Amino acid sequence: MSLEALQQRLGYRFSKPELLQQALTHRSHNAMHNERLEFLGDSILNCAVADMLYGMFGKLDEGDLSRVRANLVKQQALYEIAQMLLLPDELRLGEGELKSGGFRRPSILADALEAIFGAVFLDGGFDAARTLIRKLYIPILEQVDPRTLGKDAKTLLQEYLQGHKIALPQYAVVATHGAAHNQQFEVECTIPKLEIRVSGSGASRRAAEQSAAKLALEEAHRLVPQLVKRSRAERTGKTRKQATPPDPQLSLRLKE
């Protein structure tokens, strides 16, 4: 198989192309598969991303750095990068896995990408692997907010309301639908001060709460600026009223 186009997309040329070929080989294809390279690449990825975050975000504490890193190295993030690199076209799969659509499976694509990182490390050393990882991740980091990346909707809503000194939302299950083994929960989220009342649904109470929180957060982002603007206008009006000096002519007329 020709790997020239993939090497161009990676921006790295292998001195041992067989390493790249192995990185793209699933265990269903033959014995020289990519699982050991994946194991190695996983560690390289975590180290390189940690180094990158440490240098880029000097104000984030250890907990936030760990949260951001976990979000960047999880399967979904790797899958999206693998899609961008057109890895589905390059995978070597066994016949059964190929027929079942393995080239579209997120886990297989994520594993192959980690294996590529491991292959680059063996071929060119840690600096080469780190350079590749930075090339792939810097554009992603430029588009995300590290303060919120990886936080769920309930957490984001709570932090947003606390930041504006608004009482926390209330959640209540208002309905359940379906058979016991396949229930759908409907949860209502209310924020009295903002007059927000929205509902979300999900296969579990937690999922339904997250769905409702996401909708409530969207509403809060729309309403809170209006509330702040109105509050400032009211304070400005009171200040002006208090600062207005008495009219001496009016005082004379009142005395008469």
UniProtKB/Swiss-Prot annotation:
<feature type="active site">
    <location>
        <position position="114"/>
    </location>
</feature>
<dbReference type="GO" id="GO:0003725">
    <property type="term" value="F:double-stranded RNA binding"/>
</dbReference>
<keyword id="KW-0460">Magnesium</keyword>
<keyword id="KW-0540">Nuclease</keyword>
<feature type="binding site">
    <location>
        <position position="114"/>
    </location>
    <ligand>
        <name>Mg(2+)</name>
    </ligand>
</feature>
<protein>
    <recommendedName>
        <fullName>Ribonuclease 3</fullName>
        <ecNumber>3.1.26.3</ecNumber>
    </recommendedName>
</protein>
<keyword id="KW-0507">mRNA processing</keyword>
<dbReference type="Pfam" id="PF00035">
    <property type="entry name" value="dsrm"/>
</dbReference>
<feature type="binding site">
    <location>
        <position position="38"/>
    </location>
    <ligand>
        <name>Mg(2+)</name>
    </ligand>
</feature>
<dbReference type="GO" id="GO:0008033">
    <property type="term" value="P:tRNA processing"/>
</dbReference>
<keyword id="KW-0699">rRNA-binding</keyword>
<keyword id="KW-0479">Metal-binding</keyword>
<dbReference type="GO" id="GO:0006397">
    <property type="term" value="P:mRNA processing"/>
</dbReference>
<dbReference type="GO" id="GO:0004525">
    <property type="term" value="F:ribonuclease III activity"/>
</dbReference>
<keyword id="KW-0819">tRNA processing</keyword>
<comment type="subunit">
    <text>Homodimer.</text>
</comment>
<dbReference type="Pfam" id="PF14622">
    <property type="entry name" value="Ribonucleas_3_3"/>
</dbReference>
<dbReference type="GO" id="GO:0010468">
    <property type="term" value="P:regulation of gene expression"/>
</dbReference>
<feature type="active site">
    <location>
        <position position="42"/>
    </location>
</feature>
<dbReference type="GO" id="GO:0046872">
    <property type="term" value="F:metal ion binding"/>
</dbReference>
<dbReference type="InterPro" id="IPR011907">
    <property type="entry name" value="RNase_III"/>
</dbReference>
<dbReference type="InterPro" id="IPR014720">
    <property type="entry name" value="dsRBD_dom"/>
</dbReference>
<dbReference type="GO" id="GO:0019843">
    <property type="term" value="F:rRNA binding"/>
</dbReference>
<feature type="region of interest" description="Disordered">
    <location>
        <begin position="227"/>
        <end position="256"/>
    </location>
</feature>
<keyword id="KW-0378">Hydrolase</keyword>
<keyword id="KW-0963">Cytoplasm</keyword>
<feature type="domain" description="RNase III">
    <location>
        <begin position="3"/>
        <end position="125"/>
    </location>
</feature>
<feature type="domain" description="DRBM">
    <location>
        <begin position="152"/>
        <end position="222"/>
    </location>
</feature>
<feature type="binding site">
    <location>
        <position position="111"/>
    </location>
    <ligand>
        <name>Mg(2+)</name>
    </ligand>
</feature>
<comment type="function">
    <text>Digests double-stranded RNA. Involved in the processing of primary rRNA transcript to yield the immediate precursors to the large and small rRNAs (23S and 16S). Processes some mRNAs, and tRNAs when they are encoded in the rRNA operon. Processes pre-crRNA and tracrRNA of type II CRISPR loci if present in the organism.</text>
</comment>
<keyword id="KW-0255">Endonuclease</keyword>
<comment type="similarity">
    <text>Belongs to the ribonuclease III family.</text>
</comment>
<dbReference type="GO" id="GO:0006364">
    <property type="term" value="P:rRNA processing"/>
</dbReference>
<dbReference type="InterPro" id="IPR036389">
    <property type="entry name" value="RNase_III_sf"/>
</dbReference>
<dbReference type="InterPro" id="IPR000999">
    <property type="entry name" value="RNase_III_dom"/>
</dbReference>
<dbReference type="GO" id="GO:0005737">
    <property type="term" value="C:cytoplasm"/>
</dbReference>
<keyword id="KW-0694">RNA-binding</keyword>
<keyword id="KW-0698">rRNA processing</keyword>
